[in-house]
């Protein structure tokens, strides 16, 4: 019997998740792998034997947040020297061994393709090893047969592919998540039907470039058709796609099938063709607008959201104004808007000067946010009087007497809990809601009797 086997012990695992929905899904993968290794989950870092921080690397403030969190966990390590603390996810992959040079209470650094090794790595730490880093990228790992532990609720994320081949100059994802590889479509069908039988009503399909999915001759549109034909899931959503991968067949499926929600996240990033070329986005401003027109022509009641970066290297005021012009023309329902932030290892960091001042970036972001907030408000006001089929997802964050859910096109909607009904019996049901008022972020209405 080997040393590791003799000394093996388990314990309680606490996982704290930062960043995107795929990290949420990956935390479920980690939880499942640890459960298979006879560890139990813990809701509280104070009473845990192992703490994992599943991290993001998209922006600089994501790194700062993790450094601060690790420092704040130092007192637990002092109180219990046998506590194992690990950093997982994209920050782990991006920085690797460098994290051990920061004088942080840290034992493990493990990238997204290496989670199967976590139980073994923990035993190595407990056997006396220090500062273990494992950040190999895999060309094949999809965790296909690992069933993530389901969080209580009526909706779930399902990763269908991992990695990205686009290498946009500002983006760290190809370096932290590796090249594209897709899951077996039959495995995805099985997972989603299993979730449905456990009470899940809505799934969101995930991938760094989700609509480039292709496996065993099945493309993304083919996978959607399989899910519509072979599962009974009530609603299907997806994120994040690339504008270059929107075949007409996919849009027609959306137009013809109410279960495939008319809700598309279409990252613009910038509205000027020269800037888009510097970003290596593989489309021009005009081509992006053509995609939007085709989407709206085939799926008239679609909700379109986006991502936009301001202050990219060498972006002039006139080029920024081009972005504002595209935002006015497209009339996005909502946008995630950010100041450009250099990321270690990206081509933009290596080859382009970060030469737009912080003051200018902030001013541009404020201008963009103000414009989009106004557009979002008008878009929502235009929905007043309409009736939507809403899957009740939860109670409102502001009141237990308010329910909330999203329209098929993705707009968050809140409405009163009917008298004599409990929230627990209503969550998971689908109701017709008439919209009565709107803010820039939320529709408000009432359930039709």
Curated annotation (Swiss-Prot):
It is an enzyme of class 2 (transferase). InterPro entries: Elp3/MiaA/NifB-like_rSAM, Methylthiotransferase, Methylthiotransferase_CS, Methylthiotransferase_N, Methylthiotransferase_N_sf, MiaB_methiolase, rSAM, rSAM_horseshoe. [4Fe-4S] cluster 1 binds at residues 20, 56, 90. One of its GO terms (molecular function) is 4 iron, 4 sulfur cluster binding. Keywords: 4Fe-4S, Cytoplasm, Iron, Iron-sulfur, Metal-binding, S-adenosyl-L-methionine, Transferase, tRNA processing. CDD domains: Radical_SAM. It comes from the Bacteria. [4Fe-4S] cluster 2 binds at residues 164, 168, 171. Its EC number is 2.8.4.3. Residues 381-449 form the TRAM domain. The keyword Lyase does not apply. Residues 11-127 form the MTTase N-terminal domain. Gene3D superfamilies: Methylthiotransferase, N-terminal domain, tm_1862 like domain. SMART domains: Elp3. Residues 150-378 form the Radical SAM core domain. It is found in: Cytoplasm. It catalyses: N(6)-dimethylallyladenosine(37) in tRNA + (sulfur carrier)-SH + AH2 + 2 S-adenosyl-L-methionine = 2-methylsulfanyl-N(6)-dimethylallyladenosine(37) in tRNA + (sulfur carrier)-H + 5'-deoxyadenosine + L-methionine + A + S-adenosyl-L-homocysteine + 2 H(+). Its cofactor is [4Fe-4S] cluster. GO terms for cellular component: cytosol. Binds 2 [4Fe-4S] clusters. One cluster is coordinated with 3 cysteines and an exchangeable S-adenosyl-L-methionine. Its main location: cytoplasm. The keyword Cytoplasm applies. Belongs to the methylthiotransferase family. MiaB subfamily. Catalyzes the methylthiolation of N6-(dimethylallyl)adenosine (i(6)A), leading to the formation of 2-methylthio-N6-(dimethylallyl)adenosine (ms(2)i(6)A) at position 37 in tRNAs that read codons beginning with uridine. Monomer. This is tRNA-2-methylthio-N(6)-dimethylallyladenosine synthase. It comes from Leptospira borgpetersenii serovar Hardjo-bovis (strain JB197).
């Amino acid at each position: 019997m080997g040393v590791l086997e003799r000394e093996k012990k388990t314990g309680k695992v606490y996982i704290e998740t930062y960043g995107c929905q795929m990290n949420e899904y990956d935390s479920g993968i980690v939880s499942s792998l640890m459960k298979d290794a006879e560890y139990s989950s813990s809701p509280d870092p104070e009473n845990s034997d192992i703490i994992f921080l599943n991290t993001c690397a998209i922006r600089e403030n994501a790194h700062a947040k993790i450094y601060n969190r690790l420092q704040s966990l130092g007192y637990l390590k002092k109180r219990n020297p046998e506590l194992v603390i690990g950093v997982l996810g994209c920050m782990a992959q991006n920085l690797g061994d460098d994290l051990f040079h920061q004088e942080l209470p840290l034992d493990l650094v493990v990238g997204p393709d290496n989670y199967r090794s976590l139980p073994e790595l923990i035993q190595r730490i407990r056997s006396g090893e220090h500062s273990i880093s494992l950040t190999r990228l895999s060309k094949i790992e999809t965790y296909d047969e690992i069933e993530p532990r389901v969080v209580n609720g009526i909706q779930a994320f399902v990763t269908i592919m991992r990695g990205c081949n686009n290498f946009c100059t500002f983006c760290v994802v190809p370096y932290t998540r590796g090249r594209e590889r897709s899951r077996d479509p039959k495995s995805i069908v099985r997972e989603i039907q299993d979730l449905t039988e456990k009470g899940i009503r809505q799934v969101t399909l995930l991938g760094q470039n989700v609509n480039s999915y292709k496996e065993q001759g099945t493309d993304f549109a083919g996978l959607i058709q399989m899910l519509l034909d072979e599962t009974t899931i009530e609603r299907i959503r997806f994120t994040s796609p690339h504008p270059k991968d929107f075949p007409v067949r996919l849009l027609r499926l959306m137009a013809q099938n109410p279960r495939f929600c008319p809700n598309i996240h279409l990252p613009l990033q910038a509205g000027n063709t020269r800037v888009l070329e510097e970003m290596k986005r593989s489309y021009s401003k005009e081509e992006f607008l053509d995609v939007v027109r085709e989407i709206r022509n085939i799926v008239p009641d679609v909700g379109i959201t986006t991502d936009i970066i301001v202050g990219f290297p060498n972006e002039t005021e006139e080029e920024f104004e081009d972005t504002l012009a595209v935002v006015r023309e497209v009339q996005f329902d909502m946008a995630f808007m950010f100041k450009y932030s250099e990321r270690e290892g990206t081509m933009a960091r290596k080859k382009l000067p970060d030469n737009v001042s912080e003051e200018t970036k902030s001013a541009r972001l404020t201008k963009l946010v103000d414009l989009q907030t106004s557009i979002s408000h008008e878009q929502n006001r235009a929905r007043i009087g309409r009736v939507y089929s809403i899957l009740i997802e939860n109670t409102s964050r502001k009141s237990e007497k308010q329910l909330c859910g999203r329209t098929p096109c993705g707009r968050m909607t809140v409405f009163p809990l009917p008298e004599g009904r409990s929230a627990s019996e209503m969550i998971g049901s689908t109701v017709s809601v008439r919209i009565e008022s709107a803010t820039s972020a939320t529709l408000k209405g009432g359930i039709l009797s």
